[in-house]
């Protein structure tokens, strides 16, 4: 509480969450959806939310994430539509994973979408959209790595979605 009070006194928002796991899932709903989709599409948050087909895919993936969260005992406090609207309001922002892709850096998708797919396995949740996007990201990561090796740039570790 003292940390939160100090941050608030400094003019920052710093709520103390009683159910941190629920709030983590709210964040993960966005990251596990928009980071991999942005890498596959090259699009900003607003563009993905405005395009009917990527918005539908994002909503489907979020529904899968919510099902996994519920089976894991979490109760995220935001609706899918509210999460999508929030992402769209962020505007023409490129996700950190898309920025990494454009900079030629390793893609850190294992901690993002692969973790959700692992939790789907543990909770016996189908999550076909999440799995399909993870598979496409895994192939992208492998293709990038092969291209770098063939170009003589040396192998760079890539945390791929599997």
Name these PLM-found stretches.
Residues 1-77, 82:
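Internal alpha-helical scaffold of NAD(P)-dependent oxidoreductase catalytic cores
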